[in-house]
Each structure stands twice: as structure tokens, then as C-alpha cells.
């Protein structure tokens, strides 16, 4: 067994010595270490002033890192000092134990390190701590470590939404697409949510924004125009193409299938082709590509909307607005002359968003980084079996994307 002096040296409980050690008789039980204060200089925890008088002493049970197979409990006489500077009783400042903490700083640090690759429940079980204790430790660490953005260097933003829970509950995430840092997260996806983001910005930050990448959410655009009127809106390719797939390709596929009620084999082929039509051709294997080609050759409306989808994508890759506008006019004319109702309707609606497509030529932004963040958010939720503490969840997300070093 370790003797008292060796235990004192290994423990490193600054300002305290080991009075006695109670070893358990059975393995896996609790090792109790009774400490006694030895520091001659006592400092106020609040102001750091030297104090001479002890107001009161209470014994606190504090968990420390395990020793071998034993869980360690420290019995710490916690002194409250009379501080002349503060004008009242204050706790003594300790280098290894925080105010009101029931675990040592090194145990808290060990929990934080494990939480980077595990979840609260697993870490709590490993150290035999309460779930809420581990969560509180990690939350305090995140509050201290998550750095605030340097708004003086941020000129571009990307805004998107992600699902908080099942049942259509959402939150808005704002990202620096250049520095790859999550800047802000707020509950909801309404104008009020976007307004809350702009209202918390430091003076002058909103006026430095040059462009914001968003989907076609009107709520975001209205608040951007209200708070950063100089910023250009850039509509994201992914969201526009996804909307085209839902409102045009899927609608035409269903209409074509309904026209083939008498030809069940052909109808079955079209009904089961949704995945083939919506997925990028580059992601299809050879057999799937052959099936797609056969389907498009046999159905002119599906071929039309499929080809126009690829033409629509090209609008985002022009570097000159004049060329992009010319390509848009050509695409719009083809859509109008197609005779396909769903395509005509989509083209009419998209015309009102043309400014956000042309702005992509001047500001090559997209929300792809936000989509990557959304995938990480799913992993964080899955690892934690969901988060009931919204602030803790948002801190986890911000910690996962601290940004590139500038």
C-alpha cells in the first residue's frame, strides 16, 4: 500500500497534506483520503487578496482520479476566509479545485478528454460519476474554450437550418464559409431567429458583410436586407436543384406514371425510377446508368426535365454575370417552350430569384460547409442520444467547428 507521504507527493493537493488514508478491504471499493490544510498564505478566491482570519471550515467530499482499481474520495476541509477587501466571508482559492466543484480539476480534465471521442453516459459510467455531474463539467469547459468570432475579419456568411428533433423543430446555424467557423446558432428558422443573430452583432459587423449564402428562405433574406443592405444574396446550388427535383422531376414522373395505368410494366418502371432521376449521374454505376438512359429515351417529358436540370446547374459556374444572364435567358426560353406545366411554374418562380444566382459570379459562395456541419450535428446527436439542454448542444456544435487559424 502507498504510505501517507508518497500519497501526498503523488496527489499534489497544493496547500493540503494527507492526514490519513483509509484503504478498503475489498477491491473496487472507495479509497478515502483525509486532507488537512497546511498553507500559511490564504488567498481570497474572489479578489486574490491575502487573508489572515478563517471564518469557518466545512468538510467537503471531492472525487479525484481513480488509483488502481479504487475510486478516490477526498475529504477536504474547505475554509471560508474573512476578506477585508471584499468585506465578508469568501472561499479560499485552491489551484486544484474550483468553486462549488465536487471533483478535482484533473478529473474534470480527464472527463473532457474522453468526451471528445465518447458520450456523457459512457464517461459517467467509466468514472462512476453522475450523468449531470459529467455534463456540467463538460459544459463549463466548453463555455471557457469556445472562442468568440473576430467579427472585424468576417465578410462572408452562410446561413442554413437543421432539425433539432423529430416533429419539425429547427434551429438556424450561421457559418463563416471562409474560416470554416460556426459563428452563431439560434432556435427556430423564422425572421425573428435571423433578427436575433444580427442584433447580437458588435457595432459595424453587419456593415462589413459583403455576401450571404442561403437557400431560398425568404425570412433570412428579409432580415439580411434590413440589417446588411449592402450584402448580396447568393442562392445555394444544392437547395435550388433539390427544389427542382421535388417540384419538377418528381411531379413529371408521377404524371407520366399516371398516364400509363393501362401499361402496368411501363408504369412500374417509371414509378420506381425516382432515385435514378434525382441522383447525380456521376454517382450511378454502369448498370444504373444504362437503366437511366433507357428510361429517358423512352419518355420525352422526363428527358426534357432531366436535361434542363443539368443546364440549370451550369448557371452557378459562370464567372461573368453577363454570360450567366445569357445562359439563364436560354434556359428560361427552353422551359417556357417545353409545354410541361410543372417546369413552367418552377421557371416563373425562379425568375424572381435570379439576382441571387447572378451574384454567385461575384461571390463564389455556397452552403456546402453548412451541409457538412449538419452531418456532424447528426453524429453529435446520435452520440449523445439527443440533448435536452439546448445551450449545451449548441456549444458542442461550435466546439466541433472552431475555425481555421487566421
Curated annotation (Swiss-Prot):
* Top-level lineage group: Bacteria
Disulfide-bonded cysteine pairs: these are: none
Family membership, please give it: Belongs to the transposase 12 family.
Full protein name: Transposase for insertion sequence element IS1001
Please cite one Gene Ontology biological process associated with this protein: DNA recombination
Matching Pfam families, A to Z?
DDE_Tnp_ISL3, HTH_Tnp_ISL3, Zn_ribbon_ISL3
Going by the UniProt record, its keywords in alphabetical order are:
DNA recombination, DNA-binding, Transposable element, Transposition
Q: What does this protein do?
A: Involved in the transposition of the insertion sequence.
Q: Does the keyword DNA-binding apply?
A: yes
Recorded source organism is Bordetella parapertussis
Provide the GO MF annotations for this entry. Answer: DNA binding
Record InterPro entries:
Transpos_ISL3, Transposase_DDE, Transposase_HTH, Transposase_Znf
